[in-house]
Amino acid sequence: MSILNRQASASVLYDTPGPKARTRYRAFGVLSVLGIAGLLWYVFNALNDNGQFDAGLWDAFQYTFVQQRIVDGLLSTLEAFGLAALFSLTLGALLAAGQLSDHRPVRWFCTAFTQFFRAMPLLILIVGLYYAFFAQQPMWALVLGLTLYNGAVQAEIIRSGVNAVPRGQGEAAYGLGMRKTQVMMSILVPQAVRSMLPTMIGQLVVTLKDTSLGFVITYHELLFVGKAIASQPINAAGFPYIPVVLVIGPIYIVMCLLLTALARWIEARGRRGANRRTSASA
């Protein structure tokens, strides 16, 4: 019965393609794959003709001081990300609470603050903070810029999650005599965070990648270190642009994958805890 229902719902959404349509779709798929493969082959040949895949370009990574610079850049990236993640989540929670406040001045201020920094280009914000206040401390210009921008985004995520909780739950809590602070902290916010956790972690992944903007203000994070290594010629082999990309790029990918895996683990653990509480109450 469920299979029939799925087929019926699918037929409502779109017409089932016939034999000619399926053949046409397969042809489009094959042509797309061939086109992408041809483009990749063209790029590979162009880079290979310029010597970007010469073995000599990898010699830079044999030196201990180069390896240490990459490690230091990675640690600087993680330091900036850790501070920005902590501060942006805290700021986002405060701004979300302010936007949901019953006091109009607080609600208006928090809403204006959130909308302003959401609309502000992050690079302009970081560069402005650097030249205005943190010319000698580029890390704090990067951290504060990431905090203001991502805090505003996190505030909207949390606010949307709270508003998505069924209204009846809050009304029932008020009916039991609970104050608004108790309703928010005990009922609405936990459910909002649980439902919006994937989106919040997704924004933290964006925060992690945005730490690479620190190279613009000479903060020695991972991208800045990679750019410095790539700008040094390796004897007669040339500049190691491709080797640097192949080393630095996967580091960012692994960090983002680990953060995503952490989010899935936290989400699964929260579901198991909720199921246990439901079973115990039953």
Label each PLM-derived region with a short phrase.
Residues 2-282:
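Transmembrane alpha-helices and adjacent helix-loop boundaries
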